């Protein structure tokens, strides 16, 4: 149900500010045209642009903390989350599992309780038109992970990509 009063309050509030973080460029390289009508240039351009934008966002996520993916664990048996190749998930990625902790002032902070890694062959290909091109992993609906360290994970705990050297 739409609450028009809340929408109006949000739209009229002038206390929001934006801070420029950075920029990223991307070049569309090896694009598979499978699943496209070759005679429809707008469909080809849409796929090229969408994939390039997704790639740029992934690069921003790797470079700036503000852009890092934070998403809940969807399940724990098996460990899954609703992220995939569109968000830059590869077998080399590592994610910290975060548990919310509420202090005496009611503020929420997050404590690391473990680290997980994507399982090869079980990474969801959720990129634009991956299903149409029959890409590996496009038949999945989430990415499966394995525990690297820690334990006692619960659905809903946040995961966040960490840098691994």
Whereabouts are the PLM-identified features?
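Surface-exposed, polar/charged interaction patches used for macromolecular assembly or partner binding
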Residues: 1-165
């Amino acid at each position: 149900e739409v609450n028009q009063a809340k929408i109006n309050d949000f739209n009229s509030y002038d206390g929001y500010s934006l801070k420029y973080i950075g920029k990223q460029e991307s070049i569309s390289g090896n694009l598979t045209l499978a699943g496209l009508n070759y005679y429809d240039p707008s469909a080809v351009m849409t796929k090229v642009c969408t994939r390039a934008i997704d790639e740029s966002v992934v690069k921003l996520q790797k470079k700036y903390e503000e852009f890092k993916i934070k998403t809940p664990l969807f399940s724990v048996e098996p460990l899954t989350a609703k992220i995939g190749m569109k968000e830059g998930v590869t077998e080399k990625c590592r994610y910290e599992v975060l548990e919310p902790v509420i202090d005496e002032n009611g503020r929420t902070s997050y404590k690391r309780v473990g680290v997980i890694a994507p399982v090869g062959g079980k990474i969801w290909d959720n990129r634009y038109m991956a299903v149409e091109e029959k890409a590996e992993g496009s038949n999945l609906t989430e990415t499966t992970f394995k525990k690297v360290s820690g334990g006692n994970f619960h659905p809903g705990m946040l995961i966040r990509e960490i840098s691994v050297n």
